[in-house]
């Protein structure tokens, strides 16, 4: 994930320099309006057209999906469990098969990559050779008609990727590749999360003792909604020299279709779990089989132990040296590096519940339970996930049934 965050801040500064160059060029010449108009839609579209404002429609429960996954390590993270090695993608399939539902998948993932690198073989904001992704993308374009579902996610932080990596444009390119081949397909944006303990230096989080994970999650939800809305429009900001010089040229991304892009609210489910852990309902069970009480940190691969329970401190609190305190903390597994962004086996289980509920439009209550979770905790998590998914207006799922 970190490579995708490097140089994005510097990229923004370079854009300002390009705009100054643009101002100088405008003093020398004036581009005819026809030239700019011709540059505004450079991806030819011979595909079906369905124009209009995207409307989030309710989804009837599905009996099977053929899904193509596009993303980075928060899609492909692996963990060991009693079921063997699991990933998000494999666990969604396990859940589906347990219900007698169809599940077929393909994937196009690369650790730490924004959608730009997955489409064009290199990112815009930093140097990385991802050329091996181009043949995979071309293969997807050639076989897209085999899929009825597309799940994509973006590198973090999303607000920086929107500007420096032209996220909406590349989301649109993948969207059009699928929609042109299968107009009845559905496209989903997988909303992820920020570092639980604020360990990402490229997101410019406040110092650790002031870092408010929940507030950051709530604030960043709008970035995901903005990306989904932009990708569903037939006019998106196109990368290239015009964009670098400050001219917002537009492209349809390969089609004029404007069906909605739905959101898989994994990040929102984590926020809901955060809240319920602090204020449990009478039916909640957070007692883990090993005798401990579930914490949000249990969802992550290797967070710090003994994170100060009174953080974040209020603005009025006496200032301290957070770096010195964090330096004394140890990750749960001292033999490995601190990791507060990737998922543990329990985290993969939780996020897979969110994906199953959203993609199939079905309650996850009653899905298989690993012994590490236990029946009581599993039912609490399954009920919470269904409440989040079925009440999120961007998920495309609504239901009257409750736990």
Identify the function of each model-found stretch.
Residues 1-17:
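N-terminal secretory signal peptides that target proteins for export/translocation
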Residues 24-33:
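Bacterial N-terminal signal peptides
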Residues 136-341, 345:
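Alpha-helical cap/lid subdomain in secreted, periplasmic
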Residues 123-141:
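Glycine-rich, highly charged phosphate/nucleotide-binding loops
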Residues 365, 369-403:
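A cross-kingdom marker for long, charged
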Residues 102-120, 268-271:
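Short connector loops at secondary-structure junctions
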Residues 35-47:
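Signal peptide processing junction and immediate N-terminal pro/mature segment
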Residues 45-109:
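Serine-esterase "nucleophile elbow" of acetyl-processing enzymes
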């Amino acid at each position: 994930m970190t490579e995708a965050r490097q140089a994005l801040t510097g990229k923004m500064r370079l854009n300002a320099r390009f705009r100054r160059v643009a101002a100088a060029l405008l003093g020398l010449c004036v581009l005819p309006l026809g030239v700019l108009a011709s540059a505004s839609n450079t991806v030819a579209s011979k595909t079906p057209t369905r124009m209009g404002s995207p409307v989030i429609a309710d989804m009837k429960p599905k009996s099977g999906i053929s899904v193509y996954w596009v993303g980075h390590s928060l899609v492909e993270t692996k963990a060991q469990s009693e079921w063997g090695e699991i990933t998000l993608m494999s666990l969604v399939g396990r859940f589906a098969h347990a219900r007698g539902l169809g599940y077929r998948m393909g994937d196009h993932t690369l650790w730490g990559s924004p959608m730009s690198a997955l489409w064009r073989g290199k990112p815009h904001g930093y140097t990385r050779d991802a050329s091996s992704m181009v043949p995979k993308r071309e293969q997807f374009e050639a076989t897209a008609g085999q899929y009825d579902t597309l799940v994509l996610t973006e590198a973090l932080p999303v607000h920086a990727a929107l500007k420096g990596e032209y996220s909406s444009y590349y989301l649109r390119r993948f969207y059009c590749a699928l929609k042109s081949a299968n107009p009845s397909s559905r496209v989903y944006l997988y909303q992820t999360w920020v570092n639980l303990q604020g360990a990402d230096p490229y997101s410019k989080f406040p110092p650790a003792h002031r870092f408010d994970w929940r507030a950051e999650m709530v604030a960043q939800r709008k970035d995901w909604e903005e990306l989904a809305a932009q990708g569903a429009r037939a006019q998106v900001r196109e990368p290239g020299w015009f964009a670098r010089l400050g001219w917002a040229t537009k492209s349809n991304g390969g089609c004029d279709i404007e069906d909605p892009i739905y959101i898989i609210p994994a990040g929102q489910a984590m926020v809901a779990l955060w809240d319920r852990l602090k204020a449990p309902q009478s039916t909640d069970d957070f007692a883990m089989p090993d005798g401990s009480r579930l914490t949000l940190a249990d969802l992550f691969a290797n967070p710090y132990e003994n994170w100060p329970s009174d953080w974040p401190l209020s603005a009025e609190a006496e200032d301290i040296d957070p770096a010195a305190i964090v330096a004394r903390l140890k990750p749960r597994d001292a033999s490995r590096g601190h990791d507060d962004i990737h998922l543990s086996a329990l985290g993969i289980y939780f996020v897979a519940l969110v994906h199953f509920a959203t993609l199939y439009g079905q309650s996850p209550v009653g899905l298989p339970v690993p012994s590490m979770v236990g029946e009581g905790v599993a039912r609490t998590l399954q009920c919470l996930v269904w409440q989040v998914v079925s009440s999120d207006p961007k998920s495309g799922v609504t239901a009257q049934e409750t736990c």
